[in-house]
Amino acid sequence: MSTSTAAPAPSLSDLCPAALRRPVAAALRALDPAPARLAVAVSGGADSAMLAVAAAAALPPGCTLRLFHVHHGLQAAADQWAAQVRGLGALLGVPVDEARVTVPPGQGLGMEAAARLARYQALAGLARQHGVRHILLAHHRNDQAETVLLRLLRGTGLQGMAAMAPLSERDGVAYLRPWLDVDRAAILALAGAVRAQCGWQAVQDPTNTDPRYARAAVRTQLAPALDARWPGWQAIVARHARQMAEAAEIVAEVARADFDTLEPADAGRSFSLAAWRGLSAARQAQALRHWLASQDAPMPTEARLAELQRQLRQLHALGHDRHLRWQHAGRVVRCERGRVWIDD
């Protein structure tokens, strides 16, 4: 008499479709040298949790994976979210590391921006603690489209319209966003499959649908109207962001090349005023932006930069004995003996 044995249930990694696994694998293959340690920033929501599943499925040989969770304490259910992340780590067989932060009020930042700053600082701390150089973030095509709309409405420039980059560095950590061309519907489908398989359910952040927050207002009020009139608009806007990123890179290359002709000295702290005046107005502005960024100075508004540009153009009428002193964010730009300097 023969007996039949039920097939073993698939692991969570087996549930991950190629459309979600392949972008992660491609992002990891592009890293040189290949990382020995990798982390996923996991809030407990569907997006970051499913990225953890995809990362476990795409993890190359010789690389270890960790989940980093930042506990903000901003929501009553924050402890439950942390528990959900620990549960996901147990299902994946992956260690979970938690950092608790307090989001300070004020600092001239809104709550969204302050929480984001605290989160990045906490992630950098966890990365240093565990020797991790690369962290995966779960931003997807819908997030990218929302970012472009928000920045457009806030009057951003070319660099801002490029929105989120697939790879960026901050505080010594490389952040990878492999899903910027992935629609969220595919992520939610995997979350549903995971829930059906093992009962693990993603947490719901109420701020994601609270229109008091700018991004949530775009998501709940503007996006539905665009969905109805222009289905698939997120892909179009995300493509626009990629094109803006290419354009911004070209502008940056021109600005670097122009600045190199300005006789820079003292580690780039000064340049020739006469050489700068030989540039067109648009290239003067880009050279100034490049210079300020290279000196770790906060980027001024368009109006403030135009004022600096105007003053530099008019210096010839003041004579060499009259020194420009343009103050910005604790830094001072001055002109002396035909050279423009920036001081702390």
Curated annotation (Swiss-Prot):
Keywords: ATP-binding, Cytoplasm, Ligase, Nucleotide-binding, tRNA processing. InterPro entries: Rossmann-like_a/b/a_fold, TilS/TtcA_N, tRNA_Ile_lys_synt, tRNA_Ile_lys_synt_N, tRNA_Ile_lys_synt_subst-bd. Signal peptide: none annotated. Transmembrane segments: none annotated. Coiled coil: none annotated. It is found in: Cytoplasm. CDD domains: TilS_N (cd01992). It catalyses: cytidine(34) in tRNA(Ile2) + L-lysine + ATP = lysidine(34) in tRNA(Ile2) + AMP + diphosphate + H(+). GO terms for molecular function: ATP binding; tRNA(Ile)-lysidine synthase activity. It is an enzyme of class 6 (ligase). Its EC number is 6.3.4.19. NCBIfam families: lysidine_TilS_N. PANTHER family: TRNA(ILE)-LYSIDINE SYNTHASE-RELATED. Belongs to the tRNA(Ile)-lysidine synthase family. This is tRNA(Ile)-lysidine synthase. The gene is tilS.
